[in-house]
Amino acid sequence: MSDWRLTENVLDQNIPETKPRESKTRLEEIQRLALFQEELDIIEELDDPVDVWYRCIEWLLETRFLGMETVNKMLDDAIQYLERCRFALNDVRHLLIQLAKIKQSYETPDELQQAAKQFYQLASKGIGLELALFYEEYGSLLIRMQRWKEASEVFHAAVSREARPLVRLLRNAAEFSRAYDLHNAHPSIHDAPYSSPFPPPRIVLGSKPVSSSTLPSKPKSFQVFSDASSSRDSQNASDLPQAKSLESEANTPNLPLLYDKSSGKRVEYSAFNFLALYENGEERSMEECRAQRYLSSIQPNTAASFPKVVPKNEISVHHDSSSSNVSPIYKNPVAEQSDTPTRSLPKNYAYVAKSTSPELKVFDTVMPVALSPKPAQKPPSPTIHTKAALADILDIFNQPLRSESLEKSSKSPISAQSSYLGTPLKNDENSSNSGATSLTGRSQEEHLDFIPSLTPSKNYPSKIYSPNKNLDFSHTASKAETYKNSNELENVKREQPFSELLPSTLQEETATGTTSTTFANAKRRPEDSNISPTNPKKLHTLPRSPQYSTVDSNSVLSPAMPKGYMFVNENQSMKHESSVSNPVATIPHENGKHDFGQLSPIEHKPFFPKNDDELPGPSGYLTMPYEEAMASLSNLPTLINPLDQSLRDLLFQVLRPSLLRDKDYHEHETSFALVEHIESFVSKIKPKAGGPGRRRSSNRHSLDGPEFHLFYPPNTNLSVISKLGQGAFAPVYLVKSKIETENGDVSQGGAENNESKLFALKIETPPSCFEFYLTRQAMTRLKGLRETNSILPVHQLHMFHDTSHLLMDYRPQGSILDLVNSMHNSTFSSSGMDEILVVFFSIEFLRIIEALHTHKIIHGDLKADNALLRLETVADSEWSPIYSPEGLYGWSFKGIYLIDFGRGIDLSLFEEKVKFIADWDTDLQDCIEMREGRPWTYQIDYHGLAAIIYTMLFGQYIETRIEVINGQRRQVLTQRMKRYWNQDLWHRLFDLLLNPTLHVSEENLPMTEELSKIRIEMEEWLVNHSTGGSGLKGLLKSIEKRKI
């Protein structure tokens, strides 16, 4: 009889054979075993301990120099541990470890019998009973032992239990069934001894055994008891039982039986809340519960605290726990006049207000009104005219109008605040004179204080920065009065208001204009949706990284303008009055659908004056003495929120004197009212085929098209061409301009000649000066260093009451994120850039971050879309293919631009002991200190840099996990490095950036020396590998030609 085995040897597929690797040494295997032992020491803290044992056993079976004693010991330890874990009973990795132990007994017949016993023990322990692998290997072993009946029972049990995977199990069971039918006629199958392959089921008390194996094959007959054949006379009388008197037992009184006499009526059932009987762990009688409920009906202040039972189809009656705060008009006059207890209402009754006077419509008297309960029905179908659908339609038509509901709510004695909070407020004279109360219960005086809404961590002090309430920011003194004591300014640049230049009708309309939304504490909000991938088939395109939004960009509304004032002659040129520096804009005529080839320019004055009392934050120029601001800044606590608006207002007062000395900083005593007009203009411009997005190069096609002209005093003419992108805080527009000073010279950072040059204009709402300040500070502190080439210059800042306008250089090559997405779209690959490119850009990032941190500047918002490509044109003869770390031979013209310093921090303004804490929603793009609510300083930039390098390497946003290594919590990457990468260098770099405080103490940050060492290693590697393959020069040249 031929031997039969499974066609699919699942065990051999899952358990690797012992194939020693020649490249290993005994020392390497011992070191690897020690690493596994470290993981096993902390296995109780891991989420998946089975994985550690499985990887360890799998590796041990491949070792060459470690003896079988070590392998067997680890197998026994693994089995002993996993058998105690209930979650590992049906884990396939646990079963594979058990099979690896059993496989050692697959040689001789005696060992096969021992292996069958081990399978029997696994079944008794419930290991692998839900896995098809267990039954397949068990049945294969029994067939090798010629135990076909037991094998058939094993496969039947597997199919009945629907072991997984079921499809493979059914296929193997069908194959076994065909082989069993062929051997069924052989007499040796029927003569072979039978023993159950599974242990008998446990018998529960009161249940009959089901398994036939527990019953004896031949039950014995009952034995009849008989006395021994001996003489009755020889028996001792004392051995016989004594006779008892039946008469004494009959006279014994029986025990009374307790039962309820039947009344002859139908059995009644009552419902009761038995939880009320055992309230607070004490048992109470039903009479006590009834009495307490009776007392609660006549004494509301002494109402019982146990839950109330609401019978079916009955509307519950709500009782207030206290009536001390209720106005007398809400009291029940019926209950006050009568001392008799209120009678309980029958079912289907509820309290309904009955009006006794025309002014009081609710809560006057309480009268019971019968309600007919509506049966619960399913939602009606919108296509079938059922009664329920008609009832819903009638309810819609019968509901009160919005104006009527508002009028009724105003007449109601319950105020809007009380209805919102759920309980009526006390309506007395004191409350009416104390000012309007907001929904949070704060008066108007309290809202004048700048109090941050930070919720500190429980492990850190709760004293977060909150300025002194005695500081007065409400006055709007002139600049001369503000700084007359400190002698800070001699000549203050301040444009004259143009309210007198506007028509009277326009002044009346702008007087009622809406103010911009105040800048609340920063909360994270995703960016605009127009940055999504343009091609739906290219699924690997990364979206823009999340931004931190604080206000709605649509909150600034422009007042209406008189039509008679806006239209002028088409050929009329812009004229400026000599007495005033008047900002003027020229926009296309928006009269329905018109052709952009025939535009009618409209000249008007877009900036409207506002009342300073209505202006939020620094945009209103709320000033305070310079000495007082510096004193408040020096008295800050050690833990502050860097984005708290009150702190930023204080910093603005400190920085304002130095900003006013800058000739490129301009403050306007007006509001900008053209944001909506600009948006309307750019929305009508049709982009090129390929879709919208933040593609800077795709906007060059509209240079010869229509323009939206703007004029900023004193002498800046801008022409809006198109929209570059939409951030969470501000839109960015492509503009062209010719910037000249009063003497006719080009302003700082401007064009080298009088021809038009392209710029980027960022209009931020609410206004902020910190991006302009930090960018200028970085350029000043790094002056003369090579790192200044990596900072995008800013040229002018115009501060209005509602917006700030930052003019900066325009770079059409795109950002690092655009480059990653472009490579995804061109190669349809999920990976990132070439490693040599990642090393080059990482060196540029490390160099600029080291320089900024050395000069106490934190960028605060490092991400892939805040770094622009800087690939300037260099002659091929002047550009060496070998990389130069010193920037020689044309390499100084290649690198990156850092942008968006708006969330940056100038540490020189704070004490050295000051640390920061995040008060916004965080994710994996933030450092672990921010996610865990711990203080941080430079860690935010280190994590941001790690996220950028991760995106360049893998083409994804960074994902990390926490591992305990050598007793220390470390952040590690979830992705594995490719085998041909320089893994050692990348692992050390990511470990340094993700775990900086494990390498340097928090007091010794920043760790510029450690980063400098790794940067030098990367530069040496890049010098040796810059000419391999396509070469670094060839890759950069292809990026320059690529349309990002």
UniProtKB/Swiss-Prot annotation:
<feature type="active site" description="Proton acceptor">
    <location>
        <position position="861"/>
    </location>
</feature>
<dbReference type="GO" id="GO:1905318">
    <property type="term" value="P:meiosis I spindle assembly checkpoint signaling"/>
</dbReference>
<dbReference type="GO" id="GO:0000775">
    <property type="term" value="C:chromosome, centromeric region"/>
</dbReference>
<feature type="binding site">
    <location>
        <position position="728"/>
    </location>
    <ligand>
        <name>ATP</name>
    </ligand>
</feature>
<dbReference type="GO" id="GO:0000939">
    <property type="term" value="C:inner kinetochore"/>
</dbReference>
<dbReference type="InterPro" id="IPR015661">
    <property type="entry name" value="Bub1/Mad3"/>
</dbReference>
<feature type="region of interest" description="Disordered">
    <location>
        <begin position="484"/>
        <end position="555"/>
    </location>
</feature>
<feature type="compositionally biased region" description="Polar residues">
    <location>
        <begin position="430"/>
        <end position="442"/>
    </location>
</feature>
<protein>
    <recommendedName>
        <fullName>Spindle assembly checkpoint serine/threonine-protein kinase bub1</fullName>
        <ecNumber>2.7.11.1</ecNumber>
    </recommendedName>
</protein>
<dbReference type="GO" id="GO:1990298">
    <property type="term" value="C:bub1-bub3 complex"/>
</dbReference>
<keyword id="KW-0808">Transferase</keyword>
<dbReference type="GO" id="GO:0005524">
    <property type="term" value="F:ATP binding"/>
</dbReference>
<keyword id="KW-0159">Chromosome partition</keyword>
<keyword id="KW-0067">ATP-binding</keyword>
<feature type="binding site">
    <location>
        <position position="865"/>
    </location>
    <ligand>
        <name>ATP</name>
    </ligand>
</feature>
<dbReference type="Pfam" id="PF00069">
    <property type="entry name" value="Pkinase"/>
</dbReference>
<dbReference type="InterPro" id="IPR000719">
    <property type="entry name" value="Prot_kinase_dom"/>
</dbReference>
<keyword id="KW-0137">Centromere</keyword>
<feature type="binding site">
    <location>
        <position position="729"/>
    </location>
    <ligand>
        <name>ATP</name>
    </ligand>
</feature>
<dbReference type="InterPro" id="IPR013212">
    <property type="entry name" value="Mad3/Bub1_I"/>
</dbReference>
<feature type="region of interest" description="Disordered">
    <location>
        <begin position="404"/>
        <end position="446"/>
    </location>
</feature>
<feature type="binding site">
    <location>
        <position position="762"/>
    </location>
    <ligand>
        <name>ATP</name>
    </ligand>
</feature>
<dbReference type="GO" id="GO:0007094">
    <property type="term" value="P:mitotic spindle assembly checkpoint signaling"/>
</dbReference>
<comment type="subunit">
    <text>Part of the BUB1-BUB3 complex, composed of bub1 and bub3. Interacts with spc7 (when phosphorylated on MELT motifs); to recruit the bub1-bub3 complex to kinetochores. Interacts with mad3.</text>
</comment>
<dbReference type="GO" id="GO:0071957">
    <property type="term" value="C:old mitotic spindle pole body"/>
</dbReference>
<feature type="region of interest" description="Disordered">
    <location>
        <begin position="317"/>
        <end position="343"/>
    </location>
</feature>
<dbReference type="GO" id="GO:0042802">
    <property type="term" value="F:identical protein binding"/>
</dbReference>
<dbReference type="GO" id="GO:0044732">
    <property type="term" value="C:mitotic spindle pole body"/>
</dbReference>
<keyword id="KW-0158">Chromosome</keyword>
<keyword id="KW-0723">Serine/threonine-protein kinase</keyword>
<feature type="binding site">
    <location>
        <position position="866"/>
    </location>
    <ligand>
        <name>ATP</name>
    </ligand>
</feature>
<feature type="binding site">
    <location>
        <position position="730"/>
    </location>
    <ligand>
        <name>ATP</name>
    </ligand>
</feature>
<dbReference type="GO" id="GO:1990758">
    <property type="term" value="P:mitotic sister chromatid biorientation"/>
</dbReference>
<keyword id="KW-0597">Phosphoprotein</keyword>
<keyword id="KW-0131">Cell cycle</keyword>
<dbReference type="GO" id="GO:0005634">
    <property type="term" value="C:nucleus"/>
</dbReference>
<keyword id="KW-0547">Nucleotide-binding</keyword>
<comment type="similarity">
    <text>Belongs to the protein kinase superfamily. Ser/Thr protein kinase family. BUB1 subfamily.</text>
</comment>
<feature type="domain" description="BUB1 N-terminal">
    <location>
        <begin position="36"/>
        <end position="204"/>
    </location>
</feature>
<dbReference type="GO" id="GO:0045143">
    <property type="term" value="P:homologous chromosome segregation"/>
</dbReference>
<keyword id="KW-0539">Nucleus</keyword>
<dbReference type="GO" id="GO:0004672">
    <property type="term" value="F:protein kinase activity"/>
</dbReference>
